[in-house]
């Protein structure tokens, strides 16, 4: 059992100005990470960020801490999280650091690390960094202090990497695509990738100002994208979240296409092309419709705990190459080491171009079960609502009523004081009623 104090399921995250997302904490974090990670010869760390205004402050703090530990910082500027993972590998850096709170509002921020091979740090390394933070900061000799520099061609490098995951013999020239970059880190990457592959691109959510990241745009709110797809009579829409590790799509009729459907399309295309290795990994939240659709194709399916790090662990355990969360994290280990929204989107576009099929038609082989997800906020430190007898009783009643034609899942958020209530079944009205019954029970605790 991990006893990490600061690191959550996706690094360290919180409201800017409140512990732990403060300049002094982040400076010490940089120093502690530098002490732990300085094990090889390069002594350099890649630092990327999304478009939050607080990114400037936090990257300066990290730089100071790393320099004190004798490590040099290479800044990418605003860059998608998977791009930092990629650049960490190609530069042979000790590690990569991303300053982002992903899909959260601008006033939150976070720090997450990538190892030298572009994967998330093991728990043991995070625990070692936390242990180092209990010590007093000590500065290396002046001659050994770290330096700072910028990778001026970081964006171009990642654009070329993304394009290389799309087959040379295909083109997007017949497609009109609306792309929504959430006013986040993909704003200068995704539109260029799609244009250079031949698409007619209409870009929205590409004017970051430091405070508008994820604000009524992006993968967590596709209403603007849906409206624009319909208004432009586009073939599809593609939305990323603030740091570009998630992708959600919209078909030409304005229907939202979730991560489960995206993985289904990619897995089925892999099967058709003969390069699917093993099965596909989802999570406890993955729709039953995905499991049934993959089963009909003869593709094995396994569920991991919620969180892309757990999806990756399950993929590695089974030796499989495809995994996803319904929220839009899609991991394709034959192409990337982490969730990469642009790359995942390109694989769906590959299936469209190769088969001359619309996104709507590609989704038609999978029937999504009605699923309700309700987030219920509780007071941190007031006890665990999931352990309350009244909540357990109502949950048991609902599970009995659904039988084997539905599912109930209650879990705590890894980053916020929220209980996530998920109910899934064949009848939408029944699912909604059951979700509200459980939600009311949690609120009453």
Swiss-Prot record:
Catalyzed chemical reaction(s): alpha-D-glucosamine 1-phosphate = D-glucosamine 6-phosphate
Modification after translation (UniProt): Activated by phosphorylation.
Pfam families listed in its UniProt record: PGM_PMM_I (PF02878), PGM_PMM_II (PF02879), PGM_PMM_III (PF02880), PGM_PMM_IV (PF00408)
Cofactor annotation: Mg(2+)
Enzyme class (EC, first level): isomerase
Protein's UniProt keywords contain Oxidoreductase: no
Top-rank lineage group of the source organism: Bacteria
SUPFAM superfamilies cross-referenced by the UniProt entry: Phosphoglucomutase, C-terminal domain, Phosphoglucomutase, first 3 domains
Xref: PANTHER family: PHOSPHOGLUCOMUTASE (ALPHA-D-GLUCOSE-1,6-BISPHOSPHATE-DEPENDENT), PHOSPHOHEXOSE MUTASE
The protein's role, per its UniProt record: Catalyzes the conversion of glucosamine-6-phosphate to glucosamine-1-phosphate.
Stated name of the protein: Phosphoglucosamine mutase
Species this chain originates from: Shigella flexneri
